[in-house]
Amino acid sequence: MSRIEGVLGGQLLHEQVRWGLREFAVYCRIELGELVEMIEMGVLEPLGAEPEQWSFAARDLQRVRTARRLARDLGINLAGIAVILDLLEERERMSVRLRAAAGAFD
């Protein structure tokens, strides 16, 4: 698997790149308050115990983008969005495992 997590805005994002709280908010074009609310509701789980220590990875960018689309397009609240995002990630993990298991029988 490539070490590239994704492509956003024409930039390749390495999976080991980390952003602090303010830097991440600016990069996502999101207000700090909205970002903190996403964290409080479980949409995002940054590394670090305190806001000053929080850091975010490339996968968090995709979660923010998806969360904002779900809220805007479908009117889903943040608690619901957190559940949906977790289920989507679980589905992806299961899909990877299924493909690996199917490949073992080829």
Description of each model-found segment:
Residues 2-27, 32-36, 40-106:
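Arg/Lys-rich, alpha-helical DNA-contact motif
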